[in-house]
């Protein structure tokens, strides 16, 4: 069980595709989407400073401000550390920066963009070979003391990298890539480690490659889902999320869809109980052979 102070929704809305990187939603459309998510009990929103080339946070913030939704009714997650080459930045090469000054500056900039006084969760976006654990801990301590972040976590960190950060700084979350087509975290000890240390996993790309690639693996899974959607009365996407949620590490899927009909169905995954054999059937079809 996570030691976090923040209670996140069982499904998290991922905003990476809301802006110019993909759907290019207007502020009005984002406003509508925020309302739609919260009306369907998806109250946690996953951001990163870099999304939309450093523009999506500000668009979301304006939409949220206009939505008139109470700040306490939602949870805002954001990430920092990746430095991208962009028109609105002086960066000359993509790199990672986890200096105390940069972490604090990034958080304060995200707060301004998101029209909020605090982040519910701050994540370090990707590990850097040059990160100094003590310096990171100082930044997080200062931000927590000032009430600018409530909880702290990581993203894409291995167990050993997490252990390094945990040395002087409590870690409540780690956002990793985990799905029915990306099985490594449940096989390499990552999810076991998080359970041992009360770190709650978030899963980005929780639908995996099922809808994005045509491969032997995805064809096997789609054939199985053709049977399971009838049995459970939900779509394949909901089944994929339910498979992720079934893991005892209490994984929180980050769903990036902006499809209205799909959003209205997503929360069914949180209450859907896949049978033991169906859960293993999905694993079996993913690897194309019986499990060991």
Regions found by a protein language model. Give the residues of each.
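Short, acidic/polar
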Residues: 24-37, 98-114, 158-162
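Beta/alpha (TIM)-barrel catalytic core signal, keyed to glycine-rich beta->alpha loops juxtaposed to Asp/Glu
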Residues: 127-292
